[in-house]
Amino acid sequence: MKMTTIKQTIMIVTDAWYPQVNGVVRTLSQTREELIRLGYDVFMLTPEGFNTIACPTYPEIRLSLLPASKVAHLIRTVSPDFLHIATEGPLGLAARNFATRNAVKFTTAYHTRFPEYIHSRTRIPLSVTYSFLRWFHKPSTALLAPTKTVFNDLSYQDIGNPALWPRGVDLHHFSPATRRKKNPKPIFIYVGRVAVEKNLSDFLDLELEGEKWVVGDGPALAHLKSKYDDVVFFGMKTRDELPAFYRQADVFVFPSKTDTFGLVLLEAMACGLPVAAFPVTGPIDVVGDSDGGVLDNDLAIACQKALKKPRGKVRAYAETFSWDNASRIFLSHLVPSQVPADYGVFDNPYKDNTSLPLKY
């Protein structure tokens, strides 16, 4: 008689999901693919199917309206073996509150320098948002941080129970391939969201011999286009289109000072493109003093030095980052959400007799 293996289910709750294009969505999407490959069922609880409004300062993000009842119903119906709350938005908040009320164990993550991001747009004091984060993540069994620097920052601020969850890069999709450089002058490129918190002016104000390219969209695009007529703006490009841009350029410039990681850094390096950035959270951990690029408080100096980095060594360094390894570390931090010692089968807060169409 053939035994049937019952797959375990992981529920990931996130306010950030497609059609958004950002590092959080790419991280969760890639992690989902890896977890499925490793034999798990993964249920993504996202804004899809909820009534939403646009986030005031980030319209691409859809904020779910009054989601608590539906979130509770979905958790009961899916009855996941593991619950991970990826974001602190309305869906994450609803899932957190349901879990704490029903003694359900869960993990959380820290993807964005939330206090600094909010402060840059609204001037809300950092102390207010840090207090919120302490409250939000306190009941989590582990708060997953992308780098050691972020881990240390969270520990210093006494936020949650930090644990490391690194990132990876698709080394097949992002690869050097054949480089067909059309421009004899150096090309300095930025790829990512075009918004105030990305600090793009520090890059675009530089006097560099060569061209400056910006690939991406966002609320600051129109303003930057009108201010910098010497910069080539390409707008949003798909994931399939990005490798060609990385291969064509000579230096990837990353002026942000608020990112926790910066997946685009790995994408660029995987294509053999050296990075120039400030020595801040994100680049410090991803690039550091490696062959992948140059960090300097003077971004122009970083750009000039990065030009001399051998592309083969840049690629070799990127090959040390693996999504398989990152996803296995993610798994190692998960805790069973249904603990028999906490409640019996008849009072399991997950169980619900109401049927509901589910999407995996």
What is the predicted function of each stretch?
Residues 75, 137, 237, 244-249, ...:
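Short alpha-helical donor nucleotide-sugar binding micro-motif in glycosyltransferases
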Residues 131-177:
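Donor nucleotide-sugar binding/catalytic pocket of nucleotide-sugar-dependent glycosyltransferases
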Residues 169-186, 222:
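Acidic anion/phosphate-binding donor-loop and adjacent secondary structure
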Residues 180-213:
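Conserved donor-binding/catalytic core segment of Leloir-type glycosyltransferases
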Residues 222-240:
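Nucleotide-activated donor-binding/catalytic signature segment of Leloir-type glycosyltransferases, i.e.
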Residues 257:
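Aromatic "clamp/platform" in nucleotide-sugar-dependent glycosyltransferases that forms part
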Residues 274-277:
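Short hydrophobic beta-strand element within catalytic cores of glycosyltransferases
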Residues 308-354:
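A charged, aromatic-enriched C-terminal amphipathic alpha-helix characteristic of glycosyltransferases
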